[in-house]
Amino acid sequence: MVSGPITAGQQPDSASVTLQTLEVSSAKAPKEVVSVAPTHTIANRDLDKMGITGISDAIHRMPGVILRDYGGAGGLKTVSIRGLGPQHTGVSYDGAQLGDTQSGQIDLSRYSLDNISDISMVIGDNEDIFMPARTAAASSSIMISSWNPVMGDRKLNLTAKLTAGAFGYVSPYIRVGSGIGDNMAWLFTGDYIHSNNNYTFSIPNGSETVKERRSNSDIDNGHIEANFQWKPNSISTLNVKYYYFDSFRHLPGPAILYNNESHEALKDVNMFGQASYRTRLSKIFSLNILGKFNWSKNRYTDRDGKYPGGVLDNRYIQREAYATASLLCVPVSGLSLSYAFDYFYNDLHSNLKQHNRPHRNSILQGLNAKYHYRWFTATARALLSVYQDFPGDGEKKISHTRLTPSAGVSFQPWMNQNFFIRLNYKGIFRMPTFNELYFDHFGSINLNPEITNQFNAGLTYNLKPQSWISNLNVTVDGYFNRVKNKIVAVPYNMFVWTMTNLGRVEAYGIDLSLNAEFPVYARQSIVCNGNYSWQKALSKTSRDKLDWNKQLPYTPVHSGAFSVAWENPWVSLVAHSYGCSARYSTTNNLPGTRLHGYMEFGFAAYHTFRFHGHELQLRADLINAFDARYEIVARYPMPGRSWSASIRFTL
């Protein structure tokens, strides 16, 4: 993953909002190398070079990531990092955390890759301390940044793209905006996706293999976004965003031999509005405030004669109101202090008679410090979290309060070399989701939060540009994670399962990443990106249990990805691959639940024509070129060989 270089001595939390000049060392290195915590960024300009075709593909290119993908365009895609589970991964969109208090998981398939200017992953605490407290309330974070309006350019800026592919896939996309005067700008984006997802798959039948075709798997997604930016002066910025997403998809269900029939469907609607204002109050103080309201609706239907009236119709509505304020102080060069206060309210309503309509008040306060001097950077954070749940129907209020610390250091042993050593620790706890607490015959209101401790030690290196190599970044990180009060499902009786705090999990491993670019001839280069992860995530609940010291479900020991691109003036070519070793779908690691490892390869070719200040790009992709047959989630087969082609015009 490649991002724009920043000066090793810069402080990104303060440089953008203060005029104070910070001490700068002569060595330059990207953020991935100088950060006190593992950080990986993929910028939009790197997507073509890496052969990335979707947001799940982008996530696959980051070390330590386990993606749960149910297959097909628009299929549910959630992220687990370093064996902690998707509920421990926070996802923010343009600076505001995305929330799903019902399940605790964010479906990344909702977000269009075309609308992303960059996507970053931070494991532990972000080095930027001028952020909402909620951003620090997750073990790891995925940060998505969309395109910003272009300030000061009054001409109409237009980008239009059309993508078509196998299995009936078609997706138009448009981005249009312009400046209003010298200090205002607007931007509108929209996209639509349709796919039949009727791909073939193989299913074993004794000693034979039977070929089937996915049915009841079509999807229609639509998304629009409106952005407005105003800069009243050189030190203040107001951003306003409205987001709307609408999706209808049929659900094929698990693949079962001789039973490919399904009548399930899911309707999703999500909309939110947010506004943020950032300003410099004085030479040493800066302020950032943000407000957001989010509304989402899910409707699940299953038409089957076993239900009264022949149909199961479950409807859920979630609402969230969120406000945050952050104050940054830079009293002297190299020292930054910040305080953040966040409040958010969540509730959940459904048409289920037994549902008790819970709501939650959350208050987070973060006190942060960062110090940088030439070869040394240190960060520290204390996060106070207060949660109050009101289950409803006369149930007693549930309260949890906890103070969690984190700290990190990065130092450069030799000032003439971009070689860094980093150490960091983060303690955090996760509140149970509404499903885990209140779901009928499943949840338990007596659950305690999960407590997580993360330790990381890493080495990073950036080679200064040479005649034979223009860029080389290498990172190696080892880690140890421990989770107490792990929330697991256990059988209450023969028919009913319930949630309880029985689990303890320990995870340890090594993450490696490498990015390199080699100039070949004039206007030609070879660009290489790769990552590898070795991970053991083990159940440590009880020695007399069958799952003692067994690998967690869907957690491979080995995983990795790579891409090699030949950039040239004619037709640029990319080869890429990702894969993982075998996994198990159950905690007991029974042989019958083993999922085979896989390695998927793909190829891409693209060229950009430039004329009269405009651009026209043509691109073709061969996906899963060698037709690998595999499952990421048990009984949800992934597509085999497929293709896509796109044309993009920029005015």
Predicted regions and their residues:
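Gram-negative outer-membrane beta-barrel transporters
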Residues: 333, 338, 375-378, 473-482, ...
